[in-house]
């Protein structure tokens, strides 16, 4: 498991299928806090939607997590909970899975972020 840095860095958490979680765990994001709660959840075909929802709610309450990565197909299952999360941290990023490609039109957080910026302002600021 990854160690927290000397300056008490924040964690990335993952809610995803086995392949997604294993990939991120091999990358070193795995952590178990002092209460023995991991920062990841492996979702499979037998996982209830309520379990995904409960895990997401636990992750947004943890003060040691700054980013939540979630497979977009699981985010769709708990869309109402994700949309209710309006705090900037932890940031929620929807990612593709092996079997479900990313679809920007389904990403409510991306839509919200796009609404904050006017494309004309971006072009004007270049010059």
Curated annotation (Swiss-Prot):
The keyword rRNA-binding does not apply. Keywords: Hydrogen ion transport, Ion transport, Transport. The keyword Transport applies. One of its GO terms (molecular function) is proton-transporting ATPase activity, rotational mechanism. Gene3D superfamilies: ATPase, V1 complex, subunit F (3.40.50.10580). It comes from the Eukaryota. One of its GO terms (cellular component) is proton-transporting V-type ATPase, V1 domain. SUPFAM superfamilies: AtpF-like. InterPro entries: ATPase_V1-cplx_f_g_su (IPR008218), ATPase_V1-cplx_fsu_euk (IPR005772), ATPase_V1_fsu_sf (IPR036906). Belongs to the V-ATPase F subunit family. V-ATPase is a heteromultimeric enzyme made up of two complexes: the ATP-hydrolytic V1 complex and the proton translocation V0 complex. The V1 complex consists of three catalytic AB heterodimers that form a heterohexamer, three peripheral stalks each consisting of EG heterodimers, one central rotor including subunits D and F, and the regulatory subunits C and H. The proton translocation complex V0 consists of the proton transport subunit a, a ring of proteolipid subunits c9c'', rotary subunit d, subunits e and f, and the accessory subunits VhaAC45 and ATP6AP2. PANTHER family: V-TYPE PROTON ATPASE SUBUNIT F (PTHR13861:SF2), VACUOLAR ATP SYNTHASE SUBUNIT F (PTHR13861). Subunit of the V1 complex of vacuolar(H+)-ATPase (V-ATPase), a multisubunit enzyme composed of a peripheral complex (V1) that hydrolyzes ATP and a membrane integral complex (V0) that translocates protons. V-ATPase is responsible for acidifying and maintaining the pH of intracellular compartments and in some cell types, is targeted to the plasma membrane, where it is responsible for acidifying the extracellular environment. This is V-type proton ATPase subunit F.
């Amino acid at each position: 498991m990854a160690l927290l840095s000397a300056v008490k860095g924040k964690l990335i958490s993952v809610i995803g299928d086995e392949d997604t979680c294993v990939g991120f765990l091999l990358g070193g994001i795995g952590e178990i806090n002092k209460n023995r709660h991991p920062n990841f959840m492996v979702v499979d075909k037998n996982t209830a939607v309520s379990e995904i929802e409960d895990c997401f709610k636990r992750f947004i309450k943890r003060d040691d997590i700054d980013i939540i990565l979630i497979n977009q197909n699981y985010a769709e299952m708990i869309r109402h909970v994700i949309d209710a999360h309006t705090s900037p941290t932890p940031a929620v990023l929807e990612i593709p899975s092996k079997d479900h490609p990313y679809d920007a039109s389904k990403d409510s957080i991306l839509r919200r972020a796009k609404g904050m910026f006017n494309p004309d302002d971006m072009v004007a600021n270049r010059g």
